[in-house]
Amino acid sequence: MMNTRALLPLSVLLMATLCLCELPIPILQRFVRSVPEECPIADPSDFKFSITSNRNKTGHWTAQVRLEHGEHEQSGSNQHNRDLWQVDLEQTTTTCAGVKSVQIITTITAPPPTAAPSIPPGYELSAVLGYYKFHKTPKTWDEARIICQQEGGHLVIINSEDESKVLQNLFSKVTKTEGATNNDYIFIGIHDRFVEGEFITIFGKPLATTGFTRWVDSIQPDNAGGNENCGSMHPNGGLNDIPCPWKLPFVCEVEL
């Protein structure tokens, strides 16, 4: 399960001017919350920002910056990744008419918001996993892969037993597909076209990295006839190797 969206970054400019005069060592704290509600972003994250400015033992002014922000949930593989926020700080000390002042200018650049994917008609949402569409019209493995790409998704890759069960449920709703070479299998996004027996995903990742390697039985994959180079799934959720030119139903996936 898996991609990039380009939106302008969000910049927040904070300026604080500290007037020294005869006051004690100044401490500036600012707490900035998320961008205004009217900003159309898909996943706003609260953040907390603070600056502490003081004079050290040598008489120099220093500023300490602290930034805390929320966690973004990235699409592509159901993994939580912390986006990088950039903090730039400039501090200057000036004297005007005998009065010293410290000026701190801080720019916080937040990552661009992630837009929600556009889901084509016919896809069903499975919570946490993604969107799936069962194509009943039989196609070859290559035709199925292209159709999924045209819909903005990809030929499904099974990453867990839970995902296998989702596909089993979709498969169970179709008893027979007219024109299919075999009604016991559906195409999925793995193959061993490059090296026999070494199955990889349509993205070039080894099958072992998907998190799901359960074959339909202990015999598979057997490369029967010497030309079974494309992946399929049995109604029991197990994997099998199938000739790529066969025409089978298939499932497309759009990741969360």
UniProtKB/Swiss-Prot annotation:
Propeptide, residue positions: 22-33
Tissue spec. comment: Hemolymph.
Domain of life: Eukaryota
A cellular component annotation (GO) from this entry: extracellular region
Residues modified by glycosylation: N56
GO MF annotations in UniProt: carbohydrate binding
Subcellular location: Secreted
Cystine bridges: C148-C252, C230-C244
Domain spans labelled C-type lectin: 146-256
Keywords on record: Calcium, Disulfide bond, Glycoprotein, Lectin, Secreted, Signal
UniProt main location, coarse: secreted
Leader sequence segment: 1-21
Induction pattern: By introduction of foreign cells into the abdominal cavity of adult P.americana.
Role this protein plays: Participates probably in the elimination of foreign substances invading the insect abdominal cavity, and in trapping intracellular symbionts, when they leak from the mycetomes into the hemolymph.
Misc: Calcium is required for lipopolysaccharide binding.
The name this protein goes by in its record: Hemolymph lipopolysaccharide-binding protein
Organism annotation: Periplaneta americana
